Amino acid sequence: MTTKISRRTFFVGGTALTALVVANLPRRASAQSRTINLYSSRHYNTDDALYDAFGEVNLIEASAEELIERIQSEGANSPGDILFTVDAGMLWRAEQAGLFQPVRSGKLNERIPENLRHPDGLWYGFTQRARVLYYSRDRVNPADLSTYEALADPQWRGKILVRPSSNVYNLSLTASRIAIHGEPETRRWLQGLVGNFARQPEGNDTAQIRAIAAGIGDVAIANSYYYIRLQKSTDPADQEVVEKVSLFFPNTGSGERGTHVNVSGAGVLKNAPNRDAAIAFLEYLASDDAQRYFAEGNNEYPVIPGVPIDPVLAAHGQLKGDPLNVSNLGRYQPDSARLMNEVGWQ
């Protein structure tokens, strides 16, 4: 069973309500219990059934920033067992705050590819999301698309759509370029990319896809699952967008590294009162059943090779992901923010 405490319940009302909520969570479950206290920034209701199949999950939901701050303020008395969040950059922030403890699990190390987990076992990726390109079917020949780097070419002047630089997905994409190419080359790429923006960055990933359909720009950078949601929607407006926009996997040509991938990941918190159950929960998330559920529930890519992908997503082709260890997405995040600010990506 999942007991859910939403962001609104958890944070509205200030310290008194927060203290009351935390006090109501069990500090330690019985030795035989499969009970954990899960702090999660994954805002997908489809996850609830997955948690129910594990055991008793007391779920506290908020943004990653709020949860990290909360865990820090709770200190040694925190009831939290696991932090589950989107983006390796956010996992890095929690890591830098000293919130995780290393996990030694042969099952996790065997199941989860090395590039999708922390080198020291502080956290593990459990879903993948690709940051892909979207393009206008009417105005763009897909043969003209190739790589993220090529989006800085003059032919795309006034045609590129993307979220603001503060978005962690863009910070992580830029961090991957720094890890691969170094800072000077990444700066040049960013300068060209910003010069090609169709408008000042605004909105979320779905807004970029919709802006292509509206004729505001021709090419957008956004995560893979947002378009799949539109494809599955019964809203005629969403179907109109799908008819006008297609998906493209960049950096997958001969000799290319592969498309940038990021993860949703989780780690056991330093003061976890239910450590054994927390590790069991992580191992459960790496099971074939849980991986299939992630794929079907939120249109994400499983991290376990061989687990079936959602058929609508699979219809776009096989993902060739960049093998870069995703821990680099956090390591270079401060440099990403600085460079993006310096070149005027607002």
Curated annotation (Swiss-Prot):
Induction: Transcript levels increase when cells are grown in the absence of iron. Periplasmic levels increase when cells are grown in high NaCl or in the absence of iron. Residues 1-31 form the signal peptide. One of its GO terms (biological process) is iron ion transport. Keywords: Ion transport, Iron, Iron transport, Membrane, Metal-binding, Periplasm, Signal, Thylakoid, Transport. SUPFAM superfamilies: Periplasmic binding protein-like II (SSF53850). It is found in: Cellular thylakoid membrane; Periplasm. GO terms for cellular component: outer membrane-bounded periplasmic space; plasma membrane-derived thylakoid membrane. Disruption phenotype: Cells grow normally in the absence of iron; double knockouts of this gene and futA1 (slr1295) grow very poorly in the absence of iron and have a marked reduction in their ability to take up Fe(3+). Predicted to be exported by the Tat system. The position of the signal peptide cleavage has not been experimentally proven. Probably part of a periplasmic ABC transporter complex futA1A2BC (TC 3.A.1.10.2) involved in Fe(3+) ion import (ferric iron). This protein and futA1 (slr1295) are subunit proteins that have redundant or overlapping substrate-binding functions. The differing subcellular locations of futA1 (predominantly thylakoid lumen) and futA2 (predominantly periplasmic) suggest they may fulfill different roles. Belongs to the bacterial solute-binding protein 1 family. This is Iron uptake protein A2. It comes from Synechocystis sp. (strain ATCC 27184 / PCC 6803 / Kazusa). The lineage of its organism: Bacteria, Bacillati, Cyanobacteriota, Cyanophyceae, Synechococcales.
